[in-house]
A protein has these predicted regions:
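Peri-transmembrane interface segments
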Residues: 36-44, 117, 288-327, 339-341, ...
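Basic-flanked hydrophobic alpha-helices used for secretion and membrane insertion
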Residues: 148, 158-300, 307
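Alpha-helical transmembrane segments, especially those used as permease/efflux helices
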Residues: 1-97, 101-109, 414-429
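Hydrophobic alpha-helical transmembrane segments of multi-pass inner-membrane transport and secretion
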Residues: 86-111, 311-348, 358, 369-383, ...
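Conserved transmembrane alpha-helices of multi-pass membrane proteins
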Residues: 5-21, 316, 364, 373-374, ...
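Short helix-loop junctions at transmembrane helix boundaries
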Residues: 23-40, 378-418, 428-440
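Juxtamembrane segments of multi-pass membrane proteins
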Residues: 52-198, 202-203, 210-211, 222, ...
Length: 450
């Protein structure tokens, strides 16, 4: 028909229009320097993929038709009906594709961040008890007193400064403390394990957080200069460490160096490693030394509270994902109502030829589910691309830290189930509307025949 030919030309034009968008996205990808640049690339990729969707649906539907034998005439009829539904469902399916892609990409980003944060906390908070910096006699507590429950301790010190126009923190650490020894460095010089703790090397080796690398634009092995009491000191960066959630530049130096070169050095609290089974004994000892229970916290409590805060923070993301899916479902419902209202006279012809309502439902449901399936399958690799961009590009440009991408099929399966429920609900509403209006269409068909 003329309508089908026009729609076929439109699909071909959309496919060809996607090619320059893909090419432009590829060209801009290698020039991403800001968050805006990253979102421009994402927009180009998503819209280009959406333009390819109608042709993809047509291709898959044609393959299904070619594989069905002529004896399965009902299935062939149902598959052919997709060509009648696609012109008016095209925009709604493109919106559904973008919704599913965003849902998969953002969910993967959040899960990757949570996994990275949890693993980082396992090492960063490896001590059993953390005493607040406000405790008056913290210096005496840091000294090993021969207690049988104490395995190790780590008293961090710190001083606030500025580096390249932004707030920075220089922390003094005990290089032999368990959390420093076990600290994972995503990037380091080959000989960084010992030299960074040396006091005799000039320039002094130093560790920096990833924000220094990605936001401060400093490479491994380069020299940075930090000011103290009007004097500039040079340090060579021998490694970068993860530092999730902080907006500051952070540097690690041995505690002796920090105390020698900076004034007003403050305590950053005390970490205590306790022998297995002796946690209660350790807490009782702290109470006997005049430290109230509110002035220290257990490792497990810190981790639990940290992850609870994380989960509450990103609950809004899950709510927005659900909202966008509902909006896409409403758009699909509106498109379905429009297409089936327009085809009521055609359905009246089917009914007069002996097609039952159940057969009608199968004939119109099969192509819709097929089109939604193609949309969902295309959303999976597109969602992976989105999550890859968010994790390895936008996250680094915006916050300055890196993390591995953690892909899980469980959220994808859950999203697929919810999508099927939304589509079936829309189909059910449309079926009720058609069933209610079909008798009127039959009467009109009978009147035309008189």
């Amino acid at each position: 028909s003329l309508m089908w030919q026009q729609d076929e030309r439109a699909r071909v034009m959309m496919m060809w229009s996607s090619l320059p968008l893909f090419a432009l996205a590829l060209a801009c990808f290698y020039r991403i320097e800001t968050v805006v640049d990253g979102f421009v690339v994402l927009t180009l990729i998503l819209f280009a993929a959406a333009l390819v969707l109608p042709v993809s649906i047509q291709f898959v539907n044609s393959m299904v038709l070619n594989r069905l034998s002529r004896r399965n005439w009902k299935l062939r009829w149902a598959a052919s009906d997709a060509f009648a539904q696609l012109p008016q469902l095209r925009v709604a399916l493109m919106a559904l594709l973008l919704t599913l892609t965003a849902n998969i990409g953002v969910t993967t980003l959040v899960n990757s961040f949570r996994d990275a944060l949890s693993n980082w906390l396992e090492i960063r908070l490896s001590a059993d008890i953390y005493i607040q910096r406000t405790v008056g006699n913290i210096d005496t507590l840091a000294v090993t007193d021969g207690s049988e429950w104490r395995i190790a301790s780590h008293q961090r010190t710190g001083v606030s400064t500025r580096w390249r126009g932004r707030p920075a923190i220089v922390q003094g650490v005990d290089v032999s403390a368990p959390d420093i020894v076990d600290m994972q460095l995503p990037e380091q010089l080959s000989d960084a394990s010992v030299p960074w703790a040396s006091l005799s090397v000039d320039p002094q080796p130093i560790l920096a957080n990833e924000q220094v690398k990605h936001l401060g634009q400093v490479a491994l092995g380069e020299t940075v200069r930090l000011e103290s009491a009007g004097q500039q000191y040079s340090y060579v960066i021998v490694g970068f460490f993860h530092d999730y959630g902080t907006p500051y530049y952070r540097f690690y130096l041995p505690s002796d160096v920090v105390k020698q070169r900076w004034q007003n050095v403050r305590s950053e609290g005390l970490a205590l490693w306790v022998a297995p089974g002796m946690l209660e004994m350790a807490e009782q000892t702290l109470i006997e030394k005049g430290i109230d229970p509110g002035e220290w916290i257990r490792q497990a409590d810190i981790k639990r509270v940290s992850l609870e805060i994380f989960d509450r923070t990103f609950q809004i993301t899950a709510a927005l994902n659900s909202l966008t899916l509902v909006v896409a479902g409403v758009a699909l419902l509106a498109a379905l109502l429009a297409v089936h209202q327009q085809r009521l006279p055609e359905y009246a012809h089917w009914y007069s030829l002996g097609v039952t309502f159940q057969e009608w439902f199968k004939l119109v449901a099969f192509p819709l589910l097929l089109m939604v399936m193609v949309t969902g399958l295309l959303a999976i690799p597109l969602g992976w691309v989105l999550s890859w961009m968010l994790v390895y590009k936008l996250n680094v440009v915006a916050f300055g830290w890196t993390m591995p991408l953690v892909w899980s099929w469980m959220p994808v399966m859950q999203l697929a189930m919810v999508t099927v429920m939304v589509v079936i609900s829309a189909l059910a509403i449309v079926a009720l509307q058609v069933r209610r209006r079909l008798p009127v269409a039959l009467k009109q068909l009978g009147g035309m025949g008189l």
